[in-house]
Regions:
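SH3-family beta-barrel domains
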Residues: 22-50, 61-65, 72-75, 82-87, ...
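Positively charged n-region of N-terminal signal peptides that target proteins for export
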Residues: 1-5
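Bacterial N-terminal signal peptides
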Residues: 7-17
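Beta-strand-rich domains and repeat architectures in extracellular enzymes and scaffolds
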Residues: 57-58
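Intrinsically disordered, low-complexity polar regions and short flexible loop motifs
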Residues: 53
């Protein structure tokens, strides 16, 4: 009896120690905001550096205001970001905005009056268009661009997580 209790305790201890915990949302060390998270480029241009300081070389320059970016790390006033092509580097936080935007991935993507493909198509957007993100349901997001507002199928957008819901 003692051996079976000892064996049970040993097994439970091993399970507790070696099974990874359920993934909790990681938080940024500087902002305590979720990592990863989406932001947008606040300015017309933004230097993308190899490391988190002005001493690091500029690898390239983002040249599109409101472009959605994904923050994957934080260090001081710097945010490590990636774009839709998974290219990235370190950008100073002052160049970023919490305003949510998305990039249209599918060419001539229909924008519907409601989150229903049988409703009126209000516009067709070309791949690469940047739109403001409004609301999201499980499969749809409401977006706006150049005076048009409507619903797009979420899988055709970059800048929003597949399971993200927004009111």
């Amino acid at each position: 009896m003692r051996n079976s209790i000892f064996g049970l305790i040993l097994t439970l201890t091993a399970l507790i120690l070696f099974i990874p915990p359920l993934q909790a949302s990681e938080r940024g060390s500087q902002t305590n905001l979720p990592i990863p998270r989406f932001v947008s480029l606040r300015t017309d241009t933004g230097n993308v550096r190899r490391g988190p300081s002005l001493n690091h070389r500029i690898d390239w320059v983002f040249k599109r205001r409101n472009m959605p970016l994904k923050v994957i790390d934080e260090y001081g006033h710097w945010r490590r970001v990636t774009d839709r092509d998974n290219e990235g580097g370190w950008v100073h936080h002052s160049l970023l905005s919490g305003t949510r935007t998305v990039i249209i991935q599918d060419d001539l993507m229909p924008i519907y009056a409601r989150a229903d493909p049988s409703t009126l198509v209000k516009a067709h957007l070309q791949a690469g268009v940047v739109a403001r993100l409004r609301k999201c349901t499980r499969d749809w997001c409401q977006i706006s661009v150049d005076g048009y507002r409507g619903w797009a199928i979420k899988t055709g957008l970059w800048g929003v997580e597949a399971d993200e819901l927004r009111d």
